Amino acid sequence: MIERPIPGADAPIGIFDSGVGGLTVARTIIDQLPHESIIYIGDTANGPYGPLPIARVREHALRIADELVERGCKMIVIACNTASAAFLRDARERYDVPVVEVILPAVRRAVAATRNGKVGVIGTVGTINSGAYQDLFAASPSIEVHAAACPRFVDFVERGITSGRQILNIAEGYLEPLQAQGVDTLVLGCTHYPLLSGVIQLAMGDHVTLVSSAEETAKDVLRILSQNDLLADPTMHPTPTYSFESTGDPELFSQLSRRFLGPVVTQIRHNMV
């Protein structure tokens, strides 16, 4: 375990993803915990993580999480399903700050949401092949799980393409087998995918409930910070600070971050981690 001075409640929350997808989680945390400061790192130089070998994903995630801990973050949020599947156990053994991931929160929400017991899961190749979702759903034996990889979705989001006939056609191809299985609940098992929720909903139909882990993850962040007496005190630090950083092209990351997050993004820092 890496031992550092225990951060106080005024320390930032560290969030990372392979790119812009984790901004969906950051946005929800900002909305639900408006007094918390945040450092967000998008590893665009090495992402997307989905097609990479698990060992490589673990290597990239380790490097970024180490930096966030070194910079005094009081909590690490792995805002990437592929990295959560590859790195969660290592992270919780390595760091003495709380580590929150995005897979279990989505599973909890899907189990509560389904009406017919048939749940679909879509994600990157790495996430689907890891079996992480399937393993967690196994704790609810009444749930029938159908999984499908949607490898091209992340690339579209990273290029800022979130609607249009081309992406809809691709979505329909990916999702048709899940429709055929009669799923009534679909887990968006990649933090990029909520940015395609309009297209995915159109392809699946209005009768299917889409589950994003962002809302449930933010609830976990609130609960764990509260349990550890780490919630920021707005009377002591009324104005939170936000740092959004990219290991790759900062200009493209800046454009997408401002589009997805709005005015909270004032400057993008190029991080050479």
Swiss-Prot record:
One of its GO terms (molecular function) is glutamate racemase activity. One of its GO terms (biological process) is cell wall organization. InterPro entries: Asp/Glu/hydantoin_racemase, Asp/Glu_race, Asp/Glu_racemase_AS_1, Asp/Glu_racemase_AS_2, Glu_race. Pathway: Cell wall biogenesis; peptidoglycan biosynthesis. It catalyses: L-glutamate = D-glutamate. Its EC number is 5.1.1.3. Substrate binds at residues 17-18, 49-50, 81-82, 191-192. Belongs to the aspartate/glutamate racemases family. Provides the (R)-glutamate required for cell wall biosynthesis. This is Glutamate racemase. It comes from Corynebacterium efficiens (strain DSM 44549 / YS-314 / AJ 12310 / JCM 11189 / NBRC 100395). The lineage of its organism: Bacteria, Bacillati, Actinomycetota, Actinomycetes, Mycobacteriales.
